[in-house]
Amino acid sequence: TVADKQARLMPLFKHLTALTREKLPLDQRDERLKGVGILPRGTLFSCFHARHLAEATELYVALYGAKDFNDFIHLCEQARQIVNEGMFVYAVSVAVLHREDCKGITVPPIQEVFPDRFVPAETINRANKEASNHPDQQSIVVEAEETGNILDPEYKLSYFREDIGINAHHWHWHIVYPATWNPTVMGKEKDRKGELFFYMHQQMCARYDSERLSNGLQRMIPFHNFDEPLEGYAPHLTSLVSGLQYASRPEGYSIHDLSDVDVQDMVRWRERILDAINMHYIVDKDNNKIPLDIEHGTDILGDIIESSDESKNVEYYGSLHNWGHVMMANITDPDHRFQENPGVMSDTSTSLRDPIFYRWHRFIDNIFQEHKKSFHPYTKEELSFPGVEVVGVSINSKTANVITTLIKESLLELSHGINFGTDQSVKVKYHHLDHEPFTYNIVVENNSGAEKHSTVRIFLAPKYDELNNKLEPDEQRRLFIELDKFFYTLTPGKNTIVRNHQDSSVTISKVRTFDQLGAGEGVSEDSTEYCSCGWPEHMLIPRGSHKGMEFELFVMLTDHDEDTVAGLSENAVCSDAVSYCGARDDRYPDKKAMGFPFDRKIEARTAAEFLTPNMGLTDIKIKFHG
């Protein structure tokens, strides 16, 4: 049964930070694992680094190809005694998410497997002392430490950047969409993977800017010049697999050549990508021209910029995004003469902590926006839905059209990831943003006289910029964050649509803990969450301000019969957070460009000029009670 399989998987993930350097001798290894074990244990595995990725791919392909579940577990158990710790978790997670006989099984949360990537080193140190000083206590709880102070204005946003949920989401997204995914080897296509790479990261940047404005800071300034000195950042994390700290970055450093790639390569790749965008086509490795058209252009570009194995010409266009992460992570020790750990930018489960992550991704996003500029703005015909009119939009919460945000406490279990030498439970108490429950109320008139199938799209954006000027539609468009997207059948006449925030198509509702999974909770073959991928529910709404920050809530209904994609399976598995994560083994269930209608430039100077009858815009306030 699924529960039995889940129980057999769990021990593989326990106490990985305590593995020794000894490896299984070559003659005792399974033939299929002869090529792995190159990256030493204790090294920080990076799924942005080409060499690390190549070995990880060899491992997950071997695990994916195991003939049955017993064989799979046998291979995993061997691999655990051979390969690098981080690579092991990455490869096993990719295999579990994609093997048919693993449907319904959930990989334990990464924050419990490697708590050292999420919890400050000082806090783990204190937990260690408490555990050894109180061996008789059943459970120990320590408070998470602060990692900075207000001398650094960016510290105001640490609640967002260092949030455990969003960092875990980023890790999971890159497991669902590995850069080295090869459809011919794996036998499955990843629909619109390149476009999803663009959209998911664009949304993270839009969310970050909303948080900045909530805190009275200006929107971020994108990275744009490969020689520019970067701001400083100190992660306060120590990797327990090596005992080395994640490198801090003093202020004023700029990126340097690495042994694998030069800064000049990055400059050249950027120029080539921008040339391709201006010419509206790329050149593949056989010198054929492939157009960057409306339907596939963003997807093709996403594969090239990331770059993934589906890049049409990696020799020519390089791997701009991935090497950018690696260069920034190795900024203080580019040639490894001091044998330091890289910084947090090297790893998907830690990179969101660093302010440069967002500035780097806005730089990447600006390249995509150049491509989007080559298309005409949406016409009224493309935006409208004849016969359908949105009459009213409101938020139903304690106070109408006001959403309250607050700081909540949660606990994270450390003892599965860290071996404290006792059986007791050791937990960290940490604080995170959250919001009160609310529902959307949308009143729609269907004047067509017939039933209509609609897709309801809900977005949110700040109304004013940092200087309190009203944002113009084209400037505001890149700040719109998707809150929900769902199907609704409109009966003729008046329809009142009520939708709970918990049903959002971007968030994951519940993350099962190590203990719950071990006890078989929530384990079933038809679970709908793409298996732990999704924006955390508690971070759905930006923080807002104490006096109530003004946002605009945008609702649009489009014709579902035109949006729908052929060949979708009836009951998609893992489709809880479909907007950011897609659905498992299925096509992306919306034909429109991701981010529609805000993915192309808007020429209208006012909202009234842009709006069509099937859209609604309403002012709401977000109030922070901190």
From Swiss-Prot:
Cu cation 1 binds at H170, H174, H201. Its main location: secreted. It holds the Pfam family Hemocyanin_M. This is Hemocyanin AA6 chain. Keywords: Copper, Disulfide bond, Metal-binding, Oxygen transport, Phosphoprotein, Secreted, Transport. Three disulfide bonds are present. Hemolymph. The modification Phosphoserine is found at S374. InterPro entries: Di-copper_centre_dom_sf, Hemocyanin/hexamerin, Hemocyanin/hexamerin_mid_dom, Hemocyanin_C, Hemocyanin_C_sf, Hemocyanin_N, Hemocyanin_N_sf, Ig_E-set. It comes from the Eukaryota. Hemocyanins are copper-containing oxygen carriers occurring freely dissolved in the hemolymph of many mollusks and arthropods. Scorpion hemocyanin is a 24-chain polymer with 8 different chains identified, assembled in hexameric substructures. It is found in: Secreted, Extracellular space. It comes from Androctonus australis. The two copper ions bound each have 3 nitrogen ligands (presumably contributed by His residues) and share a bridging ligand (possibly contributed by a Tyr residue) in addition to binding oxygen. Cu cation 2 binds at H321, H325, H361. One of its GO terms (molecular function) is oxidoreductase activity. Belongs to the tyrosinase family. Hemocyanin subfamily. GO terms for cellular component: extracellular region.
